[in-house]
Amino acid sequence: MTIAVGRAPAERGWFDVLDDWLKRDRYVFVGWSGLLLFPCAYLALGGWLTGTSFVTSWYTHGIASSYLEGGNFLTVAVSTPADAFGHSLMLLWGPEAQGNFVRWCQLGGLWNFVALHGAFGLIGFMLRQFEIARLVGVRPYNAIAFSGPIAVFVSVFLMYPLGQSSWFFAPSFGVAAIFRFLLFLQGFHNWTLNPFHMMGVAGILGGALLCAIHGATVENTLFEDSEQSNTFRAFEPTQAEETYSMVTANRFWSQIFGIAFSNKRWLHFFMLFVPVTGLWMSSIGIVGLALNLRAYDFVSQELRAAEDPEFETFYTKNILLNEGIRAWMAPQDQPHEKFVFPEEVLPRGNAL
């Protein structure tokens, strides 16, 4: 007599069916992260294209900011709401627009729409990298690296204005608008002298340098494994052997610097660590600016420059430049304040 012992098949619920459908092998992977990524990315991009095409900033900044008004790709923007609205979410059905779409656009509601959907879209993209890494069976360092751009976006577009009086002081979504924001950060926060900005610059430029050095070194040490003039055709994605000589690369840089990477894993981790850490440091610095924290103030140089007309340093010159940015930028940047500065209070260099 034969006795078959088995387990009854577990019932598949709606969650299992949905999980199978989301993770099905298709040209563009969806996944659970796609439920957040695709709608948010679509709405953020659509809101930006709509705003830059048709929506004016006359009611919020007193400027033209759309293609419809004569702007071009470098000058159009989705502008921040007016200063008077504070940190309102600017919902379409909220007390500001009261369900009127045209009024909502005029008051700057599209900026909140693009900023919030953009932030969640970026988070969805990072979760997508986590999800695919788990399914493929690789480590999640791509997702961890992408936390750097997310930190910068959230700190600049959300944390900074939350620390200030309103969304008005966040950057608008446009090329020239971002440049204006950079000048604003310099004039009102002396951002370039901030150590976190310095670490950010070192990280980004250092990452670019490492990338250039690594790419050039690999190209220099490719194995001569083809008779063709084009070395790229000699590579096969599934080949088992190395395509370049790490030993030769190590000898080359050892002769130049006296020191070189001998471990590929450490080398590539360093290429990940430098730029991502720079982005994180910049984000921390922006949060500090949101709280109006000061960085370096060399008061002794300022006092001596005030007492001695012949004493001047690059620091004191930059302080004067910052005063100039504030004095001349504020009336243009914040027309609602109706600033009027008489000529005698505008900054002048010691030599004038």
Curated annotation (Swiss-Prot):
Chlorophyll a PD2 binds at residue 197. Keywords: Chlorophyll, Chromophore, Electron transport, Iron, Magnesium, Membrane, Metal-binding, Oxidoreductase, Photosynthesis, Photosystem II, Thylakoid, Transmembrane, Transmembrane helix, Transport. GO terms for molecular function: chlorophyll binding; electron transporter, transferring electrons within the cyclic electron transport pathway of photosynthesis activity; iron ion binding; oxygen evolving activity. It is an enzyme of class 1 (oxidoreductase). The D1/D2 heterodimer binds P680, chlorophylls that are the primary electron donor of PSII, and subsequent electron acceptors. It shares a non-heme iron and each subunit binds pheophytin, quinone, additional chlorophylls, carotenoids and lipids. There is also a Cl(-1) ion associated with D1 and D2, which is required for oxygen evolution. The PSII complex binds additional chlorophylls, carotenoids and specific lipids. SUPFAM superfamilies: Bacterial photosystem II reaction centre, L and M subunits (SSF81483). Pheophytin a binds at residues 129, 142. GO terms for cellular component: photosystem II; plasma membrane-derived thylakoid membrane. The chain crosses the membrane at residues 40-60, 124-140, 152-165, 207-227, 278-294. The keyword S-adenosyl-L-methionine does not apply. Its EC number is 1.10.3.9. It holds the Pfam family Photo_RC. Belongs to the reaction center PufL/M/PsbA/D family. 2 of the reaction center chlorophylls (ChlD1 and ChlD2) are entirely coordinated by water. PANTHER family: PHOTOSYSTEM II D2 PROTEIN, PHOTOSYSTEM II PROTEIN D1. PSII is composed of 1 copy each of membrane proteins PsbA, PsbB, PsbC, PsbD, PsbE, PsbF, PsbH, PsbI, PsbJ, PsbK, PsbL, PsbM, PsbT, PsbX, PsbY, PsbZ, Psb30/Ycf12, peripheral proteins PsbO, CyanoQ (PsbQ), PsbU, PsbV and a large number of cofactors. It forms dimeric complexes. This is Photosystem II D2 protein 2.
